[in-house]
Amino acid sequence: MDRIKELALIVAGIDEEYQNGIIDGVIACAKDNAANISCFSAFGGVISGKGYDIGEYNIFNLANFERFDGVLLMINTISDPDQKNKIVAKVRKSGLPCVVFDCEDYPDFYNITIDNTSAMEELVRHIIRDHGAKRIEYLSGPASNPEAADRFEATKRVCAEFGIEIPPECIHYGEFRSNDGRRTAQKMLASGRELPDALICANDAMALTAISEFTEHGIRVPEDMIITGFDNTYNARHHFPSLTTVGRPLSQAGYNACDLVIRLIDGEECERVQRLDAVPVFAESCGCKSALSEDLAAYKKSTYHVIDSCREDINLLNRMNSELAEAESEAESMSVISGFLGDMDCECCCICMCDGWDSAWEDNGMISDGYSPKMHAPLIWDKGTVRYFGSFDTTQMNPVIHETGGNISYFLPLHFRERCLGYFVAINGDFPTKSMLCHSVLMNISNSLENIRKLISLNSAIRELDRLYVIDPLCNIYNRNGFIRAADAKFRECRRKNEKILISFIDMDGLKHVNDDFGHNEGDFALQRLSSTIVDCCREGWICARFGGDEFILLGTNVDDEDETILGETFRTRLAQINKLMNKPYLIEASIGTVVTRIKDEDTLFGLITLADEMMYQQKKKKPSRYIRR
C-alpha cells in the first residue's frame, strides 16, 4: 500500500467565496487520491490593527514542511508583502513541489491560473461600447496582489482603446474585503466630484457593499451609475440588482492544483503553467437582463435557510459569550467550549495551547512570532467524546494522528492582538469554510482565554501587593501590618479556648553604632541575622515580625509559663552561636521582654504588646551602653 501523501495548504480568508471554491476542488481531489490536507489559514486584513494581523499570520509559522510531501500555496490571498516573502522563502527552503494560484511572480513554482485579463477586458469593453460609459472609476485589490494588478491593467488597456483615462483620484485600493466597497463609496460621495458613469470593482464583495452604500444615498444602480464586480459569487448572482461580473472555474482550479502536486510528488513531468478560462457575466447592475433562471421556490428555500442559520448562529454566539464570561480557568473555559463543538459540524476539534500562555506577567513568556517548543491540548472533541492530550512537540502540529487518507485539517490561530495563545484544529467538516460563524467563534475563544490570562495576572498582582503589604522586604518576615493581621486571629482563638498566649518584644542593641561605624549594609546584615535567629526560635504555629526599625515581635500559642524562660535561653544561645560564626568586629545583641498569660476579658492585643515592650525596656536598662566589640 502506498504511503499516504500529506499536503500543506496555505491560505488567508477561507470564509471568502474565492477561497471556498478553490478549497472545495482541492478537497475533492484529495479524497479521490486518499491524500491528507493540512490547511493553515489566517483572517488577516479584516481590521486595520497591525497587532491583530500579526496574531493571525502567525499561524503560518506553525507549518512544519518537513512533515509534508507537497504545498498548495494560495499566496494571492495574503495581502501583507512581508508575510508573502517569509512564506515563499520557507517553501523554497523545503524543496517541496509547490503549486500557486493565479500568480506569475514565482516562476520556480507551478501555477494554476485563471485568465483574469480576457474576461475583464470583455466586461469593460461591454460597459463602454454597449452602455456608453465615459467617466470611469476603479476599485482595485491590494497593489501588491498580482490578480488585482492584472485586472486593473486589463481595465486600463480597454479604456485606452476608447480614449478614456482614469485620473489618479478616481483609482481606489482595498484589500478585497467587503468593507472596502462601502468605504470607497463614502469617499466618492464626500469628494464633491461628479459621480462616474461606472465604478468597476476588482471583486464582487467590494462591488456589493458599494451598491448598498450608494443606494442608501438615493443613487440608483444601474440607472445613475453602473457597478461591476469579479468572481460571480452566490451573493452577486442573487443580489438585486444582480451583479455584472466575471465567472471563474474555481473548484476546477483547486482540483487541478491538487492533482498537479500529487503527480509531481509521484515524479511525473508536468507543465509549469495551466490556464483556465473565465467568462464575463452580464447582468442587471450594468443594465442587462440577468441570465439567471433559478427556480424561485428553490431560491426562497435557500434564502430562508441562510436567514435561519444566521439566527441560530447569533443565538449560539450569545450563549457561548455568556457562558465563557463565567470561566475563570483554562479547565472551566474548555468545559464551556466543549458544549458547543457539536454544533460546528466537524468530526473532531482540538484546542492546542502554548506552554506558558497564561503567564502572569505581561513581559514574561509572551509569544508573537512562532509557537512554544511544546504545546498541550486541553480539549479534544472527537465525535462527541471529550478528552485531554498532554504535552506534544509543536513540530507535530496536530495532536490527532490520521491513519487513513482523505482528511482535511484546518489550523486556525488563537491570539489576542499579537499575543499568541495557541491554535484551533477543525478536522473533516465545512465549518471553517462554509459557516459565517467560524471567525467569530475563534475570536470568542481567544478573548475568553485572554480574559482568563488577565484574571490570573490580576490575582497574581493582588497576591504580590498583599505580600508587599504584610512582608518586610529586608528580613522576609511579617511587617507590622502582617503581624497584626495574623496575630489578631490567634489572639481571638486563645481567648475563645481560654489558652495561654506568649508575646515577646525584642529590640536590637546598638544598631546605630553598627550603622555609623561599619555602614548601613552591615546594619542591614545584622538585622537579617537577628531576624533569622528569631525565626529559628519559633515553634510550629508561632509567628514573628519586624515591628519597625530595630524592633521585632514574636507571638506563640499552646504555651506554658516555663516557655518564657525557655524562649529567653534559646534566643540568647542562638544569638551567641551566630556571633561566633560571623566573627564580625561587632556583636549582634538584643533585649527581650516576654509575657505569658491567659487572656482576661479586659486584655487587648496591643495591651499585651505594650506590657512585653515595657519588660524588654527594663532588661535593656540593665545593659552597658557600649555594644561594639574592641
Annotated model-derived regions:
Residues M1-R319, E323:
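Bacterial carbohydrate/catabolite-sensing allosteric modules
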Residues L296, H520, T565-R572, A576, ...:
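Catalytic-core segments of nucleotide cyclases and related cyclic-nucleotide turnover enzymes
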Residues R319-E323, N459-R480:
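Amphipathic HAMP/coiled-coil signal-transducing linker helices
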Residues E323-G365:
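Helix-loop-beta substructure at the N-terminus of cytosolic sensory domains
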Residues N398-H402, G406-H415:
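A short, aliphatic-rich beta-strand micro-motif
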Residues D466, N479-L502, K512-D536, A545-G549, ...:
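Conserved long alpha-helical elements within nucleotide-processing catalytic cores of c-di-GMP signaling
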Residues I543-R546, Y586:
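A short pre-motif secondary-structure segment
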